[in-house]
Structures are given as C-alpha cells and as structure tokens.
C-alpha cells in the first residue's frame, strides 16, 4: 500500500473529487508516523492528528501496483509531469524510498523527486544513484533560534549537509522554508540568499496550523508578510537583487526592496505562484479552496497579480 494525496488520487482516477486546480506533480507519501517531532507537522511523533494528514492535505492509501499503473497512464496523458515522494523518518524509511524510486522509474519515464531527510552524504549519493532528480531538504526554519524551538536537532549539522550536497550535486538539491514559524522577515531573506548562492532550489511554504499538532493554535502568517517573502525569493532566485539591497526595520521587517521598476518586474505574477522544483504546483497545500491564496497553483490573472502586489505593503 502507498499513500497518495487526494488531488493526485483524483488525477489518477483513484478518487472522484471536484478540483479547482489539478496537481501537475504526483505526490506520494511514504513512512508513517515520524520519529522526528516538528511542532507544526501532522506526522510528528507527538502529533494527535490523523495518520492520513500532511499539512492540510489528506493522503488515502491505495494498492501500490495499481497506483504505479495509473501514474504511468497519467504521465502518458501529460497530466502528471513529475513525481514527488514525501518521506517521513519512520523505521526502514530509507530503503523503502529507494524501492519506490526504482519502481516508479521502472514503470514510467517521469522525473522523481524526494522530500526526505538523508542521514549523511552517502545516503544523498544513494538517492541520486537510484534515479532521484531532486532531493528536497525540509530545513523549514529560517535560523537556529526557530529551528531549535519548532524542530529540535542540530541546526549546524543540518545546514552543513544541505550545503555540502548542493556543492557536490549542483542542480539536484532543493530546500523547503516555512514562513510563519516565529522568525523575522530578515532571517527568511538572508537564508534565501545563502541557499541561492549555493545553487539550491528554494520552495517557499506558508505555515498552516493543523489540528492535533503542537502549533494547532498558532495563526498562519499575515498575507503581507508572505507576499514580501515571495517577492524576496523571486528577486534573489532570479539574480535581480540581493538581500543587501533590501531595507529592514530594527525589528527585522522588510520595508523596501529598493528596486525602482518593481511593479514591472512583478507584472507577470510569477513571483506569487508556487515555488520549488519544476512542475510542483501543490494546489491548496497551504490554503482552503476559496480562501486566502498564499501560493497560486497556476498563472495569475492580471487582477490577481494587481491584488498580490497591493498585499505586500512595502515602498516600491
């Protein structure tokens, strides 16, 4: 058996649900209840959330052979352009991940990514040798202070492995950052710059409270904060600016990008779309349909772009 995100299951024809936007990546979850204890995660060791939850998404179980067969058909139709494995740190998780990578690669010609916590560089090498296109590290926190509070573990060791992997395997390493864990905006922007300088792909997420987790009563970030971080990521990732160009308050809030043609740069709306690996649009991973859109899963209309620019509330 294997867990499949609800949206992916609908694209595969395994579930009959109505979707506003379909995922362009097939998302599969491996592992089970995690030995790690991230305060925000539904799969954390102390979490009381449903075992079928990750963020606000439900991941029902399906027969693995059937899932791989319908994945192949979805790839042939052009509905799915990438497969991403969401892996929890459970018993046997690493070998299980290698097995599924090889099974997917042996079934269809689709790039496979893995959001996983490798133990060391040897495991990074094994994942890439098995056929992984990108390894996604869930750094999540923008600095040691927040990392220790919401994730625990060794910040320096975690960052060192990410940076070493990026240097050794350029173009094959991604990092996930969550806005809204208690960090300052300046900390997020500085980590984005640090990761970009090493060539990492940066996927930005908005904190989403999940019932049953230790952070269930914490509010999501203000949309203005998230928009500023989206713009910062977009400018840095596209080498249009560096964090040193930005102006921050003494409290660490981003006040100005100091980039005169900013409205023109942002006019296509791409800055506000889901960021991360190619073809990863994660529909409604951080949002409820009809609610506030943190990450747009498809190109924005001109009206949506105009609204998003107004939402980030900085001097432009």
Residue map of PLM features:
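Auxiliary Fe-S-binding modules of radical SAM enzymes
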Residues: 1-26, 77, 190-316
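Conserved strand-turn element in the central/C-terminal portion of the radical SAM core barrel
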Residues: 162-186, 207, 212, 218
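N-terminal [4Fe-4S]-dependent radical SAM core
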Residues: 1-61, 70-73, 271, 283
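Conserved active-site and cofactor/substrate-binding residues in soluble primary-metabolism enzymes
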Residues: 33-36, 62, 66, 95, ...
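Core AdoMet radical
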Residues: 45-94, 107-123, 130-160, 174, ...
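Generic structural signal for hydrophobic
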Residues: 74-75, 104, 127, 165, ...
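Catalytic cores of alpha/beta
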Residues: 120-130, 181-197
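Alpha-helix-loop-beta-strand connector modules within alpha/beta enzyme cores
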Residues: 95-112, 156-172, 220-245
């Amino acid at each position: 058996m294997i867990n499949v995100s609800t949206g992916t299951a609908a694209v595969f024809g395994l579930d009959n649900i109505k979707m506003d936007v379909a995922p362009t990546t097939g998302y599969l979850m491996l592992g089970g209840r995690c030995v790690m204890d991230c305060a925000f995660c539904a799969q954390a060791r102390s979490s009381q959330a449903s075992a079928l939850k990750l963020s606000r998404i439900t991941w029902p179980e399906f027969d693995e052979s059937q899932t791989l067969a319908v994945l192949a058909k979805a790839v042939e139709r052009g509905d799915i352009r990438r497969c991403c494995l969401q892996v929890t740190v459970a018993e046997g998780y690493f070998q299980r991940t290698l097995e599924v990578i090889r099974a997917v690669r042996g079934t269809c010609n689709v790039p496979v990514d893995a959001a996983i916590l490798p133990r060391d560089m040897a495991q990074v090498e094994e994942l890439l040798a098995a056929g992984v296109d990108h390894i996604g590290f869930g750094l999540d926190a923008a600095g040691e202070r927040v990392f220790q509070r919401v994730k625990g573990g060794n910040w320096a060791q975690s960052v060192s492995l990410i940076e070493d992997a990026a240097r050794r395997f350029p173009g094959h390493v991604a990092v996930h950052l969550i806005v809204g864990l208690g960090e300052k905006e300046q900390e997020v922007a500085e980590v984005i710059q640090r990761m970009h300088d090493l060539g990492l792909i940066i996927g930005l997420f908005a904190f989403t409270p999940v019932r049953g987790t230790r952070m269930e009563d914490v509010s999501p970030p203000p949309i203005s904060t998230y928009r500023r971080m989206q713009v910062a990521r977009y400018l840095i990732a596209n080498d249009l600016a560096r964090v040193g160009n930005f102006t921050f308050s003494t409290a660490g809030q981003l006040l100005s990008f100091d980039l005169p043609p900013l409205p023109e740069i942002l006019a296509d709306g791409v800055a506000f779309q889901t960021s991360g690996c190619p073809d990863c649009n994660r529909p409604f991973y951080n949002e409820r349909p009809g609610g506030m859109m943190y990450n747009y899963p498809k190109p924005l209309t001109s009206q949506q772009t105009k609204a998003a620019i107004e939402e980030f509330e900085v001097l432009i």
